[in-house]
Amino acid sequence: MAAKAFFDIKAGDERLGRIIFELFNDVPDTTRNFRELCTHKNNFGYKGSVFHRIIPGFMCQGGDFTNGDGTGGKSIYGNKFKDENFNHKHEAFSLSMANAGPNTNGSQFFITTVPCSWLDGKHVVFGKVVSGIDVVKKMESLGSTSGKPSKKIIIEDCGEC
């Protein structure tokens, strides 16, 4: 059975709700990294971090818990880790690793809001939203073409479910 993880999301002072992700079994290193960052097993992770880049009609990006602006973050394996495979495609509401080129996965991730086939083979898809699509759509509505959200979008809590 596939592992699941959750984010409880806030926009400013307003609670938007919970997103539940199903994590794929065929990318075990990537899903382990995400799960342990959700649970803070190594005393660092996603809780309290922000979605720093949200582009309507594309995606919501977060996971930079060190700098909060897309320049930081780290994996449970050290700084960066390899691309495991590209078995899954970027469909709407896919969970995928953000990177700076091949084999540069850290902690940053994004949730697609539409199919993004041009990202296939470049970013590792490791899960999908199974509950809380309405929350992702609310987050998306607070984004902009520049990517800067109109409100601070925070992962108030996170973990495994």
Swiss-Prot record:
InterPro entries: Cyclophilin-like_dom_sf, Cyclophilin-type_PPIase, Cyclophilin-type_PPIase_CS, Cyclophilin-type_PPIase_dom. Its EC number is 5.2.1.8. One of its GO terms (molecular function) is cyclosporin A binding. Keywords: Isomerase, Rotamase. It catalyses: [protein]-peptidylproline (omega=180) = [protein]-peptidylproline (omega=0). Binds cyclosporin A (CsA). CsA mediates some of its effects via an inhibitory action on PPIase. It holds the Pfam family Pro_isomerase. Found mainly in the tegument, gut epithelium, and muscle layers. Also found in the interior of the parasite. SUPFAM superfamilies: Cyclophilin-like. One of its GO terms (cellular component) is cytoplasm. PANTHER family: PEPTIDYL-PROLYL CIS-TRANS ISOMERASE (PTHR11071:SF569). Belongs to the cyclophilin-type PPIase family. PPIase A subfamily. PPIases accelerate the folding of proteins. It catalyzes the cis-trans isomerization of proline imidic peptide bonds in oligopeptides. This is Peptidyl-prolyl cis-trans isomerase.
